[in-house]
Amino acid sequence: MKKCAVIYSGGKDSHLALLEAASSGAKIACLVSFDGGAGHAEYFNDYRKPELVAAHAGLLGVPAVILKTGPDFRVKALARNVALMARAAREACGADTLVSGVARCRCGGKIDSWRKAAARAGFGLDAPVIGFDLIYAVRLCLELGVRALITGVEAKKVDRRWLGRELDGEFLAYLSAEKKAGRTVDGSDLQTLVLESPAFAGRVIPLKLVPGRIAGQELLKVEKFRVVRGRRRAGAWNRG
């Protein structure tokens, strides 16, 4: 049985990858994520979310492995970064496979480079949602009961009115209409935060959202949130 460390951001794609891996029979051993500190936005084009990743891990009943980037960190140093994640995941939770939430790989053979880098570190690498386009991913969230907040939009591609709203049937209809009009919205044009999931033993409630902008993205930073526990036992979903 595979013991998986999910490369996790708290968004819909990494969460769907986790659910897909678990449904295939894998054991989800931990979540792994980089924390870029003061340079996080420069590195990852997003706000840092270590507390949210840790909150998700608690609701899932698995450990969170948060790797702080050092002064020599480089986003494009793929082999080194994959090796860092693999080593940390192996030590923290005994994982042997990384799970990536990359969807509709837009970088040619980049996923093959990820797999080769993982193999050099003695790991497998699975990308269970790589064939998902944005419309399918949103539809799957709705079908599974995954609630996700839209926390970022590419200003030139996605109408700003969706910022701060949850993925829903109306947003799905908007994506379909854009596609029919020849203005396809890609997964990279959207950032989300999962609030509730069938795998969570509760939910995340944002309390303070602060608007901002990074490059061409309009973003909402979750400055305050709380976790509400439900009746489900954390980890009950993880039967691999």
Name each model feature, range by range.
Residues 1-240:
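Nucleotide-activated chemistry modules centered on ATP-dependent adenylation/adenylyltransferase
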